[in-house]
Design a protein with these regions (language model features):
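Predominantly transmembrane beta-strands of Gram-negative outer membrane beta-barrel pores used
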Residues: 49, 83-94, 100-108, 115-159, ...
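C-terminal beta-signal and adjacent terminal beta-strands/loops
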Residues: 444, 546-570, 586-590, 597-666
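Periplasmic N-terminal accessory/gating domains of Gram-negative outer-membrane beta-barrel systems
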Residues: 1-92, 102-108
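Outer membrane beta-barrel strand-and-loop segments of large Gram-negative receptors
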Residues: 265-267, 271-277, 315-328, 409, ...
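Face-selective signature of the C-terminal outer-membrane beta-barrel domain
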Residues: 172-190, 212-357, 373, 430-435, ...
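Transmembrane beta-strands of outer-membrane beta-barrel pores
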Residues: 88-90, 107-109, 121-125, 146-150, ...
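Surface-exposed extracellular loop regions of Gram-negative outer-membrane beta-barrel proteins
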Residues: 61, 197-202, 299-306, 377-420, ...
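Gram-negative outer-membrane beta-barrel transporters
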Residues: 334-337, 440-442, 461-555
């Protein structure tokens, strides 16, 4: 599926953020408010991969969850995006390490004739971008953004105040008609403070401040893409380096004294990647073949107070080096009358982490997709494949207090997913399409937490870190469903997409090895309508309505949580995993509205927009939580048996959020 620039630019409630726009497509669920986690076809947020002009980007969000992919705000500036190819199945063999989706961003080239610029005062940031020529054969794109999200969050009464800065560039040089080189970069600096000075603080905000750490992140990716065009052959060489520095600090009661320190976490992820690829165009057949070589370095310095049945301090340091390699090939056949298309791909990956992972044959990944035009504008489509994903570095590099790579000893393996899908597509016009598709995904060797016997697949949609714990590759799961979509694209001023998904997502945990239980993404059903319409005199209106089915949740273990030693270690409640996802929330709906007006002048344009998120003031009711009052109900008991008095707190989210934005094009 292809997402155009206008769908990103004018999307209601999207705040010009590609992750929010993708949530309009079938099979894509949304999670908690103020986050951009991609949950595709019942898979977790850690199962997605992102590419920018062929260069892999480890994450596309500010304040991202390390080990997953979500965060509250996107990094990529939409001003430079030409289109996005979104794959929710049948992933290209050249795009490995994905189980749920691949987002392949295609950037514009700079204008070779003249320079232009854009300034944006948006709902959460101020931005400046420019593009143009750098000589006869070179063009450039550059942008810088700075947020004032902390003011918005303070205005609506949130207990955390994030600030971010990001920059992006692309330089393309055309040596001659046979050779070109593109150099691109993307970087972000994130800083989150706790809003501890709030007046008349609600109990819900007290609860969040009790456990939420201070987060600081730095990320960047630099890449170069060389292409050689030789008749029917295109050769590509892609090199890149990425880095992430993630720091979390938490003090008990947010009082910064050494004895109150409960979490001090610093982790770094460095990647160096090289990929070589050849594309051959033959009569009726296109063949792509290539290979990749990568080196990753993961470091971690962790001090964390935990509680199992007694207080425990986790204290370890990691410096893990990992060499990865892979091979892939794809053949695409299209019949002479364009009635039948087939794509057959094969991929294999390996690394030197352990004997379970160092053999390419063990991660052999075939995939096949077919399309047949049954009658005029009716197409039958099908796909099947086996896909592998490497567990996150946080899991690979986890150590116990004995300085042992415990997950290496536990036989950690690649996660495997066998997938199949079939559907029908009706294209009555070039701008109109209807689709119906059923899918099935089966998971094997998913990491399962040793501590709580829950698959990592049901984690990762919150701030913090995913996977930094002892696991075994013993969890299995499945996701299946039916997707319906109607799409009208950019005809007579109208663009819209309407989608409905019936989906089930289930896993077996360590307590119920013979029974499937709902995963955290088992919403049962999803409905989304999103559209924009261009009116006379440069007016545009847009709306987005989404309905999310009843998400499952795990009740809290109040008996354990009330223990003073347990609460002081975590500053939060503990789940009762013996009742894993046994309860469900109410369904949730939200309506967003947007209006744009553009004024054209002789040498510049002015666009003003009004965006209203949650126009119906819908309330998303979350499970009740508890906060400590500070009183110990049994002070005479031994320290290990003393309990806090806990107070119940109602939780809900759903603020009507209007915002005005201004864009100036020069």
């Amino acid at each position: 599926r292809v997402i155009g620039f206008k769908e990103i630019e004018k999307s209601a409630g999207g705040n010009r953020d590609i992750s929010r726009v993708v949530q309009s497509f079938p099979g894509v669920a949304s999670t908690a408010a103020y986050r951009n986690d991609l949950v595709v076809r019942g898979g977790g947020p850690s199962e997605n991969r992102f590419f920018l002009d062929g260069v892999e980007i480890p994450n596309i969000n500010h304040f991202s969850t390390q080990g997953a992919s979500g965060g509250p705000v996107g990094i990529i500036n939409p001003d430079f995006v030409r289109e996005v190819n979104f794959y929710s199945a049948a992933f290209p063999a050249a795009r490995g390490n994905a189980l749920s989706s691949v987002l392949d961003f295609k950037l514009q080239d700079g204008n070779p004739e003249k320079s232009s610029a854009r300034a944006v005062l948006g709902a959460s940031e101020i931005a400046f971008s420019a593009n143009g020529p750098l000589g006869k054969k070179t063009t450039y794109l550059v942008s810088v953004r700075r947020s004032y999200l902390q003011f918005l969050f303070e205005l609506i009464g949130l207990p955390f105040l994030p600030t971010f800065t990001d920059a992006q560039f692309k330089i393309k040089h055309q040596f001659d008609r046979h050779n070109e080189l593109s150099v691109l970069g993307l970087g972000a600096i994130d800083d989150m403070k706790l809003n501890t000075d709030m007046k008349d603080m609600s109990d819900e905000n007290k609860y969040i401040l009790e456990y939420l750490p201070v987060v600081k992140q730095k990320t960047y990716t630099l890449g170069a893409v060389y292409k050689h065009f030789a008749g029917h052959n295109i050769y590509s060489l892609i090199g890149s380096t990425s880095y992430m520095d993630n720091r979390n600090v938490k003090y008990k009661g947010n009082i910064e004294e050494p004895e109150n320190l409960s979490l001090k976490y610093r982790s770094g992820e460095s990647e160096f990647k090289l990929r070589s690829e050849n594309l051959f165009h033959l009569p009726f057949v296109h063949i792509t073949a290539g290979g990749n070589l990568e080196y990753a370095r993961y470091t971690n310095d962790t001090y964390q107070k935990l509680y199992t049945n007694t207080p425990v301090v986790q204290d370890y340091r990691t410096a893990l080096g990992l060499m990865k390699w892979g091979l892939y090939a794809t053949a695409v056949y299209e019949s002479y009358n364009e009635r039948f298309t087939a794509s057959l791909g094969l991929r294999a990956d390996a690394n030197d982490y352990s004997n379970e992972m160092n053999n390419l044959i063990n991660q052999l990944s075939p995939r096949l997709s077919l399309s047949y035009r049954l009658y005029k504008d009716i197409y039958l489509n099908g796909n099947a494949g086996r896909f592998y994903e490497l567990p996150p570095y946080t899991t690979l590099g986890f150590k116990n207090n004995k300085d042992e790579y415990v997950n290496q000893t536990n036989g950690l393996r690649y996660i495997r997913s066998d997938q199949a899908g079939a559907g029908v597509e009706f294209r009555p016009a070039s701008y109109l399409k209807f689709t119906a598709e059923g899918f099935y995904k089966h998971y094997n060797h998913y990491p399962m937490s040793v501590l709580d016997s829950v698959p990592l697949a049901s984690k990762g949609a919150d701030f913090g870190v995913l996977g930094n714990e002892a696991v075994t590759s013993t969890a299995s799961g499945r996701a299946y469903g039916l997707e319906l979509m109607g799409r009208w694209y950019n005809y007579k001023g109208l663009t819209f997409i309407a989608s409905y998904t019936w989906v089930r997502s289930e896993y077996k945990d360590g307590r119920n090895p013979d029974k499937y239980l709902p995963s955290a993404w088992d919403n049962k059903y999803l409905f989304t309508f999103s559209g924009t319409y261009s009116l006379p005199r440069n007016w545009d209106i847009g709306a987005k309505f989404r309905l999310v089915g009843p998400a499952p949740y795990t009740p809290y273990d109040i008996e354990k949580s009330s223990l003073v030693e347990a609460w002081d270690a975590k500053g939060n409640l503990y789940y009762d995993y013996s009742r894993f996802n046994s309860e469900r929330l109410e369904p949730f709906s939200q309506l967003d509205i947007r209006v744009d007006k553009t004024y054209s002048f002789r040498k510049w344009m002015l666009t003003i927009y009004l965006d209203i998120q949650n126009a119906m003031k819908s309330t998303y009711n979350e499970p009740d939580v508890y906060i400590k009052t500070g009183n110990i109900v049994n002070p005479e008991a031994p320290a290990s048996q003393q309990r806090y008095e806990l107070k119940a707190v109602k939780r809900s989210s759903g603020t009507l959020l209007p915002s005005i934005g201004i864009m100036i094009d020069l």
